[in-house]
């Protein structure tokens, strides 16, 4: 099987403030929906993924429906959201913009957790080892997994990669991403 990968480099937070970097990611994703057909792609099979801040952006775009709606795209049209070690609370960069420190949690309109809902696209959370991860990242993702379940979401999965830290967890996460993309793709194509 062949995957087409669109790599988006997001804006640096030193130059812009929230929500500009979220909106920039949304514009790139909207471009994919609007143009993937020209490259032989299928809008029913667009998956989002990213590591760390990219994982945070993946979840913000996939869960807060207002962002893609500006482009007349329903966030539920995303085939699956597969963040690698993403913040599920408000990102520490946003908290820093608000004068907060790295370990002071916040769940507001800039937190994927704020938008836990039953009808979201499949969500596959992948993190490193709780003892090696950055700033409680595994625990944030475990909380997201639980809240999605409590919200009635039927397709949230959590993977914990023992022995891998925040930076090294990406390499062993890719086979899981491919496995999940293949499984979700099969489900989607079966419904067609």
Predicted regions and their residues:
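A fold-wide structural signal in alpha/beta-hydrolase
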Residues: 2-6, 47
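Catalytic nucleophile-loop/oxyanion-hole region of alpha/beta-hydrolase
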Residues: 6-43
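Primarily recognizes the serine-hydrolase "nucleophile elbow" in alpha/beta-hydrolase
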Residues: 30-97, 107-108
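The feature captures the conserved acid-bearing segment of alpha/beta-hydrolase catalytic domains
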Residues: 72-94, 102-146, 150
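C-terminal catalytic histidine-bearing segment of alpha/beta-hydrolase fold enzymes
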Residues: 142, 149-192
């Amino acid at each position: 099987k062949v995957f087409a990968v669109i790599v988006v480099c997001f804006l640096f937070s030193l130059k812009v403030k929230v929500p500009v970097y979220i909106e920039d990611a949304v514009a790139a994703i909207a471009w994919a929906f609007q143009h993937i057909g020209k490259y032989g792609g299928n809008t029913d099979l667009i998956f989002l993924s990213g590591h760390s801040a990219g994982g945070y952006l993946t979840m913000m775009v996939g869960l807060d429906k207002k962002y893609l709606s500006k482009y007349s795209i329903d966030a539920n049209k995303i085939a699956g959201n597969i963040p690698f070690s993403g913040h599920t609370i408000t990102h520490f960069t946003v908290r820093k913009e608000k004068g907060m420190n790295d370990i002071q949690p916040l769940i507001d309109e800039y937190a994927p957790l704020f938008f836990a809902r039953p009808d979201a696209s499949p969500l596959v959370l992948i993190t490193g080892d709780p003892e090696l991860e950055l700033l409680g990242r595994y625990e944030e993702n475990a909380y997201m997994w639980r809240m999605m379940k409590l919200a009635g979401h039927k397709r949230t999965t959590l993977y914990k990669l023992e022995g891998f830290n925040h930076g090294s967890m990406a390499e062993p996460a890719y086979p899981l991403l491919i496995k999940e993309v293949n499984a979700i793709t099969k489900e989607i194509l079966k419904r067609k």
